[in-house]
């Protein structure tokens, strides 16, 4: 009886760990349930560990949350990657740390530094 419970617990734990590893490889999509500060955090954390999930996954995560008007100017994705790796933004890739401070917000906008 005890051995059977241990086997079931072990199988459940293995399935849980596998589901975590598969879900961590996914790029998050914009969702109204994600707060503006969380969006900034997702983008900065992705760039901080740019190649963690796969090559340039952090840049792709940042691109995924970019405003459609921004994408029109900075896209497609390949062009956006080159821009982020260029002189103006390269310090964001694999940066050591960051802080996010809210400067102000309303129902329609939020500003952070």
Give the location of each predicted region.
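Bacterial N-terminal signal peptides
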Residues: 11-21
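Short, aromatic-enriched amphipathic alpha-helices that serve as compact interaction elements
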Residues: 35-51, 61, 65
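Boundary at the C-terminal end of the N-terminal hydrophobic targeting segment
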Residues: 23-27
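Alpha-helical scaffold domains
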Residues: 30-31
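Short solvent-exposed beta->alpha transition segments
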Residues: 53-107
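Bacterial N-terminal signal peptides that target proteins for export
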Residues: 2-13
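Short beta-strand segments that buttress and anchor functional surface loops
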Residues: 111-113
């Amino acid at each position: 009886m005890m051995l059977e419970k241990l086997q079931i617990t072990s199988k459940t734990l293995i399935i849980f760990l596998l589901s975590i590893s598969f879900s961590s490889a996914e790029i998050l999509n914009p969702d109204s349930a994600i707060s503006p500060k969380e969006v900034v955090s997702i983008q900065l954390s992705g760039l901080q560990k740019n190649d963690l999930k796969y090559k340039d996954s952090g840049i792709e995560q940042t691109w995924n949350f970019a405003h459609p008007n921004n994408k029109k100017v900075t896209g497609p994705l390949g062009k956006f990657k080159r821009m982020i790796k260029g002189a103006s933004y390269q310090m964001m890739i694999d940066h050591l740390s960051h802080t996010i401070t809210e400067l102000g917000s309303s129902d329609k906008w939020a500003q952070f530094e």
